[in-house]
Amino acid sequence: MQKYSHLPQLEVGILFSPEICFRLNGIFTCRTTGKKYTGAYNIRQTEDGYLLSQADHREPVSLPLTFEPEDDTTSDFDLTDVVIGIQFHWERKENQKFKGKLKIIDEQKHLTAINILSLEDYLLSVISSEMRATSSAEFLKAHAVISRSWLLAQINKAKTVRGTYSSYRVDQEEYIRWYDREDHAHFDVCADDHCQRYQGISKAYTPAVREALEATRGEVLTYEGTICDARFSKCCGGATERFDNTWEPVVHPYLDKITDAPEDLETGDLRDEQTARKWILSFPPAFCHTTDRQILSQVLNDYDQETQHFFRWQVSYPAEQLSELVYRKIGIDFGTIRDIQPIERGVSGRLIRVKITGDKKTLVIGKELIIRKTFSESHLYS
């Protein structure tokens, strides 16, 4: 672990909608229009361009627009109906409050609200959006270091791959795709689970969170002199997966299989189907296998606690419903699905390639997340 001195400004994509409603609390300046703004507004696209409205006042504007607070210490802004948990089982809308600048751009299919702020201010919210701000001090410190490392690794990587990155491999026999922050072209990271949860300042203002951030300021994880592309999860099911089996096909030696247990937990080779089956049907003594409501309420936000059976779970569908679901989720018409066969498992036992056989088509799909998306209205649990 080392200290990182250059902490950049970030652009975080918050809200994606045909119309964006926001409130500027304080005086904000927009250089595009040369005007000052305060109060409640909405912006939407019309046949003649973009219209910024406040009460009865209508103002044609050109995008992008950036609203910059005159006093960053006392000013903030609110965004209405921010969708969190996008396409996950906890998806919902929240009204959220942010510090820093508000930038609005056009991404063709929708308008996008972007928050521009410092990295450390961003982390102040992230560590209490991903976990509850009442978590123990060491939990908060660890999360601050992990989240800072992940973010800086993405920023450094973007300098080398922008415009050249592909996150899928498709041919007649396989549809292989993975998801990462490279899905975003017009800002650094998004504010949702796709990247890291960043839900504004309302959840972040606790002394413990600020103290954890200050205690670890600038600290990052490194491997052979390079900032680690650190990843985290709330529940690993007893064993973690290798990076290249879940995301892009790049091996990071520091992101390999480990067991989540007080002692080295013997799992066997979980790439083997029979061994994996035995593991999945068991309940090993893992740290994340807890039903202690007091612990869970201390570390998890309310909507995360709605998921009761997160360590082991089961989902079933009638064949006709499953066939329709798969077609709707990935746009591939298998006809009536006759068989689903595991082709490859990762070192944690997770499926990373699955063969779907229908009366119209047979295809292998992967990686882990596209499998979870394909067989669920939202996502299967990981």
Regions found by a protein language model. Give the residues of each.
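Conserved, single-site charged/polar hotspot
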Residues: 1-382
